[in-house]
């Protein structure tokens, strides 16, 4: 599973990149989506690598995102009771672990919005003009979890 965060804005974006960001549902800066690791998504990430930060998300970070930034239709917060009622998993943490392992999908929660609207990174970011490790763009690997924690 990859977490993808849009780091740059909307001005002067090439049409192909803009359309790919739209397909990924990354319409605004600091929006995040969680996508599976498939060849088609990897190709999309290759197109938008100069506008996003992405990497492999772990279960703890996904649980944190779901608990703090997970929203249902009507802008209701995601709760343990809702997860238990709809999926059978007891807590958000168990559900996040199952999603990362591939046993469940985020689509198993029927009203969950696919985009997490994150806070700008606390303590700032390195640079949005350079790639990782000098800046914040491109592939981060496991370090994306640190960035997502700063943006919780």
Swiss-Prot record:
**A single Pfam family, by name?**
Ribosomal_L30
Cellular component terms per the entry's GO annotation: cytosolic large ribosomal subunit
Matches recorded under Gene3D superfamilies: 1.10.15.30, Ribosomal protein L30, ferredoxin-like fold domain
> Which superkingdom is the protein from?
Archaea
Q: Which PROSITE patterns match?
A: RIBOSOMAL_L30
Q: Per UniProt, which keywords does this protein have?
A: Ribonucleoprotein, Ribosomal protein
Name the CDD domains on file.
Ribosomal_L7_archeal_euk
A GO term (biological process) for this protein? translation
The family database entries (InterPro entries) matched by this protein are listed as: Ribo_uL30_ferredoxin-like_sf (IPR036919), Ribosomal_uL30 (IPR039699), Ribosomal_uL30_arc (IPR005997), Ribosomal_uL30_CS (IPR018038), Ribosomal_uL30_euk_arc (IPR035808), Ribosomal_uL30_ferredoxin-like (IPR016082)
The record's annotation in NCBIfam families points to: PRK06049.1 (NF004711), uL30_arch (TIGR01309)
Family under the similarity heading: Belongs to the universal ribosomal protein uL30 family.
Assembly and interaction partners: Part of the 50S ribosomal subunit.
Protein name, per record: Large ribosomal subunit protein uL30
Q: Which organism is it from?
A: Archaeoglobus fulgidus (strain ATCC 49558 / DSM 4304 / JCM 9628 / NBRC 100126 / VC-16)
Name of the gene = rpl30
């Amino acid at each position: 599973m990859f977490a993808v965060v849009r780091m740059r804005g909307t001005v002067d974006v090439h049409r192909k990149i803009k359309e790919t960001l739209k397909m990924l549902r990354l319409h605004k800066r600091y929006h995040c989506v969680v996508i599976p690791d498939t060849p088609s998504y990897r190709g999309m990430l290759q197109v938008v690598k100069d506008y996003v930060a992405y990497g492999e998300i772990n279960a703890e970070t996904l649980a944190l995102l779901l608990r703090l930034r997970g929203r249902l239709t009507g802008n209701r917060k995601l709760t343990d009771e809702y997860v238990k009622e709809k999926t059978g998993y007891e807590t958000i943490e168990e559900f996040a672990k199952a999603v990362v392992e591939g046993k469940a999908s985020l689509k198993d929660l029927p009203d969950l919005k696919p985009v997490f609207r994150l806070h700008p990174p606390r303590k700032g970011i390195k640079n949005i003009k350079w790639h990782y490790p000098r800046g914040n763009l491109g592939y981060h690997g496991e370090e994306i979890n640190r960035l997502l924690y700063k943006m919780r």
